[in-house]
Amino acid sequence: MIANCVKAGLLCLCALGMSNNSVAQRSGTPIKNIVLVHGAWADGSGWKGVYDILVKDGFRVSIVQEPETSFQDDVAATKRVIAQQDGQCILVAHSYGGAVATEAGTDPSVVGLVYVAAHMPDAGENEADDGKRFPSDLSKSTAIKKTADGFTYLDPAQFHEYFAADLSAEQAAFMARSQVPNFADNFKAVITKPAWRSKPSWMVVATKDRTINPDLERWYATRANSRKVEIAGASHAVYVSRPKEVADVIESAARAILK
């Protein structure tokens, strides 16, 4: 009888060990590659605060510099950086960059998407039309200007008010003067196969966003069943003004999606 108990105990221990091994195999390790995509009227330098935090915490971070000359060029630039990664990655996008990431994120190396005050169109949609669902303060203003060759930019005198109200005047002025003009037709680019339909996603809602209506960001998140994080009082430039909170969301995504 004692022998039978010992055998039973050994069987239980073996079963427990097998169970723990299975869990360990499933648990894996967090994704370490992060690709950051900026939006319209900006460049990659705005990600510096988020970049510093992620790198300090052990992540390998790459920043896409989209030319904004065409939607196809921006998607290609993003895919080019994705291809440089040494494994799976999280794709993070701000503003117009959300549409770019939605199209580029179908790459098999991308295993999750984080939208930061960003557009998130579905197949057959474009961000210009989506923006009409919940018009923003910017869309009702005179701040969007157009060049003779069809590019748009934000009036530097109004940049602080509509894009970066929670930054200092000096920071906003630098962003305004370093902005990359965006080809007007980019906002009308139609999504063919949205990555968020097949991959987990997160949405950072900037509650004081005047460039994209926060209610549109919430609507996008609900439709996509994204994990939603609201950052109270944040402007459209939330990735610049609140880098710690944005980095926390990105790191949460990396921990949630295991290799």
What are the language-model segments listed below?
Residues 1-9:
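Bacterial N-terminal signal peptides that target proteins for export
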Residues 8-17:
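Bacterial N-terminal signal peptides
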Residues 27-86:
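Active-site catalytic motif of lipid deacylating hydrolases and related acyltransferases
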Residues 92-97, 101:
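Gly/Ala-rich beta-loop-alpha elbow adjacent to hydrolase catalytic centers
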Residues 109-156, 183, 187:
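Flexible "cap/lid" loop of the alpha/beta hydrolase fold
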Residues 176-197:
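Active-site nucleophile elbow and catalytic-triad environment of alpha/beta-hydrolase enzymes
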Residues 203-205:
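Short beta-strand/loop motif that positions the catalytic acidic residue
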Residues 207-234, 240, 252:
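Conserved loop-alpha-helix segment in the C-terminal half of the alpha/beta-hydrolase fold
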